[in-house]
Amino acid sequence: MSGRRRNHPGRLASIPGLRTRTGSRNQHPGIANYPADSSDFRPAQQRRALEQREQQAGQLDPARRSPSMPSANRYLPPLGQQQSEPQHNSAPPCGPYPGERIKVTRAAAQRSREMGYRMYWMVQRAATADGADKSGLTALTWPVVTNFAVDSAMAVALANTLFFAAASGESKSKVALYLLITIAPFAVIAPLIGPALDRLQHGRRVALATSFVLRTGLATLLIMNYDGATGSYPSMVLYPCALAMMVLSKSFSVLRSAVTPRVMPPSIDLVRVNSRLTVFGLLGGTIAGGAIAAGVEFVCAHLFKLPGALFVVAAITISGALLSMRIPRWVEVTAGEIPATLSYRLHRKPLRQSWPEEVKKVSGRLRQPLGRNIITSLWGNCTIKVMVGFLFLYPAFVAKEHQANGWVQLGMLGLIGTAAAIGNFAGNFTSARLQLGRPAVLVVRCTIAVTVLALAASVAGNLLMTTIATLITSGSSAIAKASLDASLQNDLPEESRASGFGRSESTLQLAWVLGGALGVMVYTDLWVGFTAVSALLILGLAQTVVSFRGDSLIPGLGGNRPVMIEQESMRRAAAVSPQ
């Protein structure tokens, strides 16, 4: 490099403390960023000396002094601005010391810590909004998020075994067998969960915690039977444990539904509460929990030949059990509550000779039958849940039938899963902002949309229409569920809402199980599977529409009942009172 180039003023002007040809050693370090040859932009010392000489000569008016002009570089101070001396205080400096250079890793750590703090307080504010921390809703939110995270981590843990290792025919037959073994007890127990909780004065929190503890044991059993060489599990252990985990997750949903009305803040309704819980579960559980499980699974599988996602499942379930016991104690109080019932019978005016029997019935426990709008919404939601359960299992076996490698199969399932997640999130986001004045009408429309999309998928029989049907079904399911919650809140007295919410959730889970069983047993051609599920959806849609019109295809379980029904024993008491 020549001496002329080394001493170029444009090169040295930006280096503090160096002398240039046109400036002194004490020039402003950013002199090159200012216009040249202008007295208004001279360094401060030169300008003050010039002003003093002009004042002494009487040539400068003090009022005409121009202020310091801004710099063209926004990171530099004005040229004439005096830099104040740093004030010494006892607080430690926040930034680096003069001359200290921040490393990339240190800057990234500081930035990550700052973003973590902001994210934590943002989530905390959202979780405690509307008085949720005082009502107990915040304490229930974290177990719900944990349950979503367990489902997501379990899906990551079993993705390799179910979609890479197992043969198609073998996996389908074994899943069908173990589905029968595990789902059949759930189908018997689920209708009894609500009445059992109505009779228990204590035990809701313990039941929620137990659903997590049992899943901890199942995850531990899978870890103990993991074969690191092949990356698989014995079939006699894998399928019962996987399906039992699914059943326990559904049981948690039923148990949670009986607790939610007891922790509802007075400033928001049940629809907003459930939408908030679902959004928290999707963001914090499904997305964040699934990402963490996928990262741990990748590291442990490649470095230690261990099922890392199952260790995440075990850790999350232990946390869920502890968080469930932190729910406030007042969710256990059931004094004054009246259980709800799905059935309803039209009772004619009793004859005089049957009056003693009616008096005996009046002396029994009070019950609250569900009204017409609730029954209509429940039938519509059950119809949609059949489709949701079908889409949960059926695409997996369809993907296995294609002669493609595991990554292609996983990509097909990822596309359908993404559509389901987007639809669910959009449906909950929309339902929280809808004015649900006529919820039964909205449920009927959602049921029609799902049935039409199922018929379209059966005609098209391709992946694109299946993805669209999944998207619409997930969104419609969220909106219909919010409409059902609105019907329960509007048409039931306060002392029966918790019981009615639990009974409805049990019924919805049974419908989901029916759809999942159909997805396992039907032939793995898209048009065949969607034709079979469309037949069920048409029957459910017919019952929904008939119930909406005040009639029923099934005696005692349709819409041939009033919109608002009095408590059963009170109505009978009025009917049999002596004239």
UniProtKB/Swiss-Prot annotation:
Disulfide pairings: none
Principal localisation: membrane
Biased composition (Polar residues): 80-90
Origin species: Mycobacterium leprae (strain TN)
Chain residue ranges for the region called Disordered: 1-100
PANTHER family recorded: INTEGRAL MEMBRANE EFFLUX PROTEIN-RELATED, INTEGRAL MEMBRANE PROTEIN
Cellular location(s): Cell membrane
Entry GO MF terms: transmembrane transporter activity
Membrane topology: Multi-pass membrane protein
Family assignment from sequence similarity: To M.tuberculosis Rv0876c.
Domain of life: Bacteria
UniProt cross-references to Pfam families, sorted A to Z: MFS_1
Signal peptide: none
Lineage: Bacteria, Bacillati, Actinomycetota, Actinomycetes, Mycobacteriales
Positions of transmembrane segments: 148-168, 175-195, 206-226, 228-248, 279-299, 303-323, 378-398, 407-427, 448-468, 504-524, 526-546
Protein name per its UniProtKB record: Uncharacterized protein ML2143
UniProt keywords, alphabetically: Cell membrane, Membrane, Transmembrane, Transmembrane helix
GO CC, any one term: plasma membrane
